[in-house]
Amino acid sequence: FLECLYNSLENLYKMHACCNSVSLKRPEMLKLDSISKSFGDKPVLNDISIEIDEGERFTLLGQSGCGKSTLLRMIAGFESPDKGKIWIEGHEISSLPVEQRPVGMIFQNYALFPHMTVYDNIAVGPRVRKLAEPEIEKRIDELLEITHLQDLKNSYPQNISGGEAQRVALARAVINRPKILLLDEPLSALDPSLRKHLREELVEMQRTLGITFLFVTHDQEEAMSMATKMCIMEKGSIKQSGTPADLYERPKSSFVANFLGEINCLNGRVEQKTGNMTTLSLGKSGKIQFIAGVDENKEQQCYVRPENIFFYSNQEHNQPMNSLEGILISINFFGNHTRYQIELADGSIFKVSLHHRKAVQHKISRGDQVRVLFAVSDVFQINEN
């Protein structure tokens, strides 16, 4: 009896765990299936496939001209794919006109009507859709409160700040309650301090509204600070997608590694393997170790982020460390951190980034011979294949 009872309880527990895991999976909001696009004989997008879950803040990151804005315009309906399909909540919308797509869009210049008040700018969409005026007023009042624009409802665009204009554009884009909001570099025209503040505001508003955000930017810091998921584009193709931490810590190509922040690339030849520990000879610059299975005598590139490196001290370390020496050739102060450049014996440049509090502990100057340390576990390789 006890054995039967135990088995029954165990089965119930497994069913409960299974149900919970299923319910925690967010439903899919947007799916791009093998999207390709050319303008004349110039390919702009090449076989793009993306899946974005409901409530996600997804960022398309890439250099100017990589196709990210074209992809956004395609989802909105301003461009048509040459090949592939677009789905929202399981419904194909590839051939739907702009006005029938359940999306909102914020343009780079916000496109506010200068002759209309804040209230009337926000009301444009629902009035076009012939929504009753009391319902329009109710929705606008709710959005004015969320965006902290209550005192500006009767103001005109030329009389409000850039940050306030951005919030008006957001309210106008979401008043028709779209399934997904598309944002085409809406912060790029703002000064750096305001841009940082509005990034935080946008994230908070997205959490409040619960709308899926698809955000286009060429700014790495902006992408990583705002996104729950992101992808990096180059020349019309996706190089890698995942969480910001995944892409930063586990890049799958040298392009992604270099695109997301600074990085040191160490070129050498595999000298020895002991278990999963590999020794890489850097020629005149010395040797380092990293954890990977690589064939001996093979040419190999390894990478380490500047913030994972520090200057030698007598402090003991509880993990295997690498050590390199060189001449300090530059020191650049950036407020909260300091960047150093060290010339190694083979002439290559090695970058170090220290938080200000750590940097002031080192009394070093240009021209000094210095020694740097970094953990074996912080060195990674990239298999481009």
Task: Describe these PLM feature segments.
Residues L61-Q63:
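The feature captures the beta-strand-to-loop junction immediately N-terminal to the Walker
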Residues S69-L72, V168:
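ABC ATPase nucleotide-binding domain helices that frame the ATP-binding cleft
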Residues A76:
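Helix-to-loop junction immediately C-terminal to a conserved catalytic motif
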Residues D82-K85, E135, K235, N267:
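Conserved coupling/switch loops of ABC nucleotide-binding domains, chiefly the family-specific signature
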Residues G84-E92:
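Conserved ABC transporter NBD signature motif
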Residues V98-G104, Q108, L112-N258:
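ABC ATPase nucleotide-binding domains
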Residues K284-I331, R357-N385:
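Glycine/charge-rich catalytic "coupling/switch" loops of P-loop NTPases
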